[in-house]
């Protein structure tokens, strides 16, 4: 069973970006390099990992990513604040 991660990044302009990956170290490096990162984060580097959750299945990680993306900024900040151990 592979590990799947949903994550929240804080961009240099203080906006938040949510995504998922199977290799968080590699994905964070990609976001910060600008070469393979998301279009959104390319112009907002550097990015910093502020929240990370491990999810057992691909379907589960996609559902969790969708849940987080639907949250308001305030809700995302509360999630980050309430779960410092998820870092």
From Swiss-Prot:
Residue span(s) of domain GIY-YIG: 2-78
CDD domains xrefs: GIY-YIG_UPF0213
SUPFAM superfamilies in UniProt: GIY-YIG endonuclease
Entry superkingdom: Bacteria
Record-stated family: Belongs to the UPF0213 family.
Protein name: UPF0213 protein SYNAS_10430
Species of the source: Syntrophus aciditrophicus (strain SB)
């Amino acid at each position: 069973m592979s590990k799947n991660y949903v994550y929240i990044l804080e961009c240099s302009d203080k906006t938040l970006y949510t995504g998922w990956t199977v290799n968080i170290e590699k994905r964070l490096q990609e976001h910060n390099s600008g070469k393979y990162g998301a279009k959104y984060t390319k112009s907002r580097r550097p990015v910093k990992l502020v929240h990370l959750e491990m999810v057992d299945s691909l379907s589960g990680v996609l559902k969790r990513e969708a849940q987080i993306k639907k949250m308001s900024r305030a809700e995302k900040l509360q999630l980050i604040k309430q779960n410092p151990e998820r870092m």
